[in-house]
Amino acid sequence: MNSLDNITKSFVEQSQNILEDNLVGIYLHGSAAMGCFNIQNSDIDLLVVVHEDIPDEIKRRYMDMVVELNAYAPKKGIELSVVRKDVCNPFVYPTPFELHFSNAHLEWYEKNPSEYIDKMKGTDKDLAAHFTIVYHRGKCLCGKEIRDVFEKVRREFYYDSIWCDVKDAEEEIKENPTYVILNLCRVLAYK
């Protein structure tokens, strides 16, 4: 099950089973949506939109599913944020999120899932960049169409979001040159 299509298909099916009627849609963004996915360097970027807050016991089931699927993902893994529909349109910045996951958080979840679920919520300026990519280049994997869920993100929010992501590029380029260089190119391309 290591292909992008198989992983996203399984993710959608299991998300529908766990989130049921609360699920608005699942949206692919990043390199996989823009046709430049590289199994060696890319993660699988997903935005999951729900109608209302997710109870902790459902978050636990959901996270267990994500972690299980993440084992089959490329080495950079799955990165996802779960947001409520009411922060997508009208767009709220910084954007509140219900849940977030990436490989950077895997160890924390595995060591203390209850703490992770309790604390992994808040706001994230980076979501403005993700919403922008979804709006312009994203793919709807299931649920409502992109333009029916997302409002176009204002330029100043997008620029603030990407600035927050690249402001430490001079140092971070040593650790993750591909990511930083591609992010800087994305900034220039958007102008």
Show where each model-derived region lies:
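Short helix-capping/linker segments at secondary-structure and domain boundaries
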Residues: 189-191
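Active-site oxyanion-binding pockets that recognize sulfate/phosphate
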Residues: 1, 52, 170, 174
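Short, structurally constrained coil/turn elements
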Residues: 19-20, 40, 74
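Helical scaffold of the NTase/Pol beta-like nucleotidyltransferase catalytic core
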Residues: 1-27, 57-58
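Conserved NTP/Mg2+-binding pocket subregion across the NTase superfamily
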Residues: 67-174, 181, 187
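Short, well-ordered alpha-helical packing segments
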Residues: 12, 16, 63-70
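Catalytic metal-binding acidic patch
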Residues: 28-64, 77-84
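A short N-terminal beta->alpha junction/helix N-cap motif
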Residues: 3, 49-53, 184
